[in-house]
């Protein structure tokens, strides 16, 4: 049983993102295997992990168990607070095996076992079902890392289905041994820093899907030792001149599926300023990490070359600088400064809307910087062509580089953010509390930070330990607002209006593409933006089965990561619903 779990953990580590594996699989521990009943019991340390693993990972774990014992196996999950301690030993051994997943499974079986036939010959991105039955390759970052097609029969024995009873094929990760452990070869920039970003010269981020972006392991700058007093004073002066926040670095940027492509693009630009993706245009809602990323790029360039001419500026401040330059008759000096920069970071460019003179000056500055091979990085709350009141010449320049969206963080990422923020405050927050907050607050990082501050203040004021009950009491007003803010009915109406269909079509059995597609999108948004369960959502969509809803959610989630137009439509719908 222990050999099975070590091999299974090694396989799952290859299939899932590091954050997913650490959050959900690593804390699990095998309890017992009943050879007569072919039943495996696996323990989870708390109720949150137990429920999530049962709903998202049971099918895959069952499939691995069936492979190992070469028979149908039922997997049962039980609650055991001591599970994490036992799990650490199992997963640590699995991580040290250093074998490919099929080989690891074969080794764990020992002399009395042979690898399951379906495991033979598995390669990089190919997926196989039992007995070599080939199925479509799995996208490693959907929902909990599993495919999103409906139930299908290809000779698989019972017990291979996921939570929805669908086929669970065997997904092979794109992640290499380098991506799992060894640090990649660095690509030094000009400068003498010992910490380097990876060489991404041959990686086309624009052609990467988020799964590939996350499968690559990047070595980013580590926290630097304290500098001598004189050097520290010089560093402070440099940051004051550039207006960069030295705290915002790649090292403390929490990465997840929602922002991994943006982070990969930022690393590419930091490695090759003025060469790759110029301009880089990042867009997304409030509090999703756009400002953090562009500060991280600037801070890395400053670390590599303290003499680099870098300027971070908010669009409103740029407008103010233009006005002051006119008032003081210092426009030549203004132009000379901005046209000579090595890196210009301009935040919230939508504030240029309607400011024609500012737009004209920025256009000339933009042209000069690009001609000089200086890097320009822009953030906004929306897609370039959706900004109103901006000159078409500027819009076309924004579109000439790389445009990347940053989405609201997914559950695991929200939990990681909360735990990291709590650690920064030297406060211990129970994991189940972090999960509770993350499940109820979904919109952005600032909202999570605000919720954490309220919890800490409430706990200190009342002299109570931080528990779920205390958290619920501290956030009762916020949770009430969240619960009444977005309803499934509102989502249905908004999607119907957006795609020009009738609201009644959301409940109907009609299946033309122009109706089925908006209905699937509405189901996806209902799952993402409300607390409704899959059966509840299905009932509100004309009494549909929960498996239909699950298929729609996974289908749209996968397509969103690959289809820029769909991603943009979903972004508009989400912003509309959130007001």
From Swiss-Prot:
Stretch list, region Domain III, AAA+ region: 243-459
Residues that hold ATP according to the record: 287, 289-291
The record ties this protein, via InterPro entries, to: AAA+_ATPase (IPR003593), Chromosome_initiator_DnaA (IPR001957), Chromosome_initiator_DnaA-like (IPR020591), Chromosome_initiator_DnaA_CS (IPR018312), DnaA_C (IPR013159), DnaA_dom (IPR013317), DnaA_N_dom (IPR024633), DnaA_N_sf (IPR038454)
* UniProt region (Domain II), positions on chain: 71-242
Subcellular location(s): the record lists: Cytoplasm
Q: Which GO terms describe its cellular component?
A: cytoplasm; plasma membrane
Its protein name is Chromosomal replication initiator protein DnaA
**Record organism:** Cupriavidus metallidurans (strain ATCC 43123 / DSM 2839 / NBRC 102507 / CH34)
């Amino acid at each position: 049983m222990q050999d099975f779990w070590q091999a299974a953990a090694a396989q799952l580590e290859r299939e899932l993102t590091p954050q997913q594996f650490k959050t959900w699989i690593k804390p699990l521990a095998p309890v017992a295997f009943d050879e007569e009943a072919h039943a495996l019991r696996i323990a989870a340390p708390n109720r949150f992990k137990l429920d999530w693993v049962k709903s998202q990972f049971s099918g895959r774990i069952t499939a691995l168990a069936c492979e190992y014992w070469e028979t149908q196996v039922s997997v049962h999950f039980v609650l055991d607070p001591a599970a994490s301690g036992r799990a650490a030993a199992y997963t640590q051994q699995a991580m040290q095996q250093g074998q490919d997943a099929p080989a690891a499974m074969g080794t764990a079986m020992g002399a009395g076992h042979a690898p399951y036939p379906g495991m033979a010959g598995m390669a990089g991105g190919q997926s196989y079902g039992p007995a070599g039955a080939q199925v479509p390759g799995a996208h490693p970052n959907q929902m909990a890392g599993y495919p999103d097609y409906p139930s299908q029969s290809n000779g698989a024995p019972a017990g291979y289905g996921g939570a929805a009873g669908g086929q669970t094929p065997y997904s092979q990760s794109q992640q290499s041994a380098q991506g799992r452990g060894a640090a990649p070869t660095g690509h030094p920039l000009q400068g003498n820093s010992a910490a380097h970003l990876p060489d991404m010269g041959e990686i086309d981020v624009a052609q990467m899907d988020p799964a590939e972006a996350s499968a690559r392991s990047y070595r980013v700058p580590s926290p630097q030792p304290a500098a001598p007093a004189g050097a520290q004073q010089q560093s402070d002066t440099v940051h004051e001149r550039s207006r960069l926040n030295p705290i915002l670095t790649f090292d403390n940027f929490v990465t997840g599926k929602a922002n991994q492509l943006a982070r990969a693009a930022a690393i590419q630009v930091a490695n090759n300023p003025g060469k790759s993706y110029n301009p880089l245009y990042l867009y997304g809602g409030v509090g999703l990490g756009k400002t953090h990323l562009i500060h991280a790029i600037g801070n890395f360039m400053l670390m590599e070359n303290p003499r680099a001419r870098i300027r971070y500026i908010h669009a409103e401040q740029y407008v103010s600088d233009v006005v002051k330059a006119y008032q003081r008759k210092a426009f030549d000096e203004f132009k000379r400064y901005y046209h000579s920069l090595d890196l210009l970071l301009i935040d919230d460019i939508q504030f240029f809307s309607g400011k024609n003179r500012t737009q004209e000056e920025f256009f000339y500055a933009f042209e000069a910087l690009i001609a000089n091979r200086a890097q320009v990085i822009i953030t906004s709350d929306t897609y370039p062509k959706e900004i109103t009141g901006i000159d078409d010449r500027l819009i076309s320049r924004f579109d000439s580089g790389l445009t990347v969206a940053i989405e609201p963080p997914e559950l695991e990422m929200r939990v990681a953010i909360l735990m990291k923020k709590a650690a920064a405050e030297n406060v211990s927050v129970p994991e189940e509390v972090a999960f509770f907050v993350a499940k109820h607050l979904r919109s952005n990082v600032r909202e999570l930070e605000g919720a954490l501050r309220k919890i800490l203040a409430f706990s200190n004021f009342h002299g109570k330990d931080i528990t779920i009950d205390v958290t619920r009491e501290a956030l009762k007003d916020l949770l009430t607002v969240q619960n009444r803010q977005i309803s499934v009915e509102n989502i249905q109406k908004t999607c119907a209006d957006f795609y020009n269909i009738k609201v009644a079509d959301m409940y109907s059995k009609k299946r033309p593409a122009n109706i089925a597609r908006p209905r699937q999108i509405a189901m996806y948004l209902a799952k993402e933006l409300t607390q409704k369960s899959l059966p509840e959502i299905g009932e509100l969509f004309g009494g549909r089965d929960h498996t239909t809803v699950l298929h729609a959610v996974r289908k749209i989630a996968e397509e969103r990561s690959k289809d820029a137009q769909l991603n943009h439509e979903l972004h508009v719908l989400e912003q509309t619903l959130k007001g």
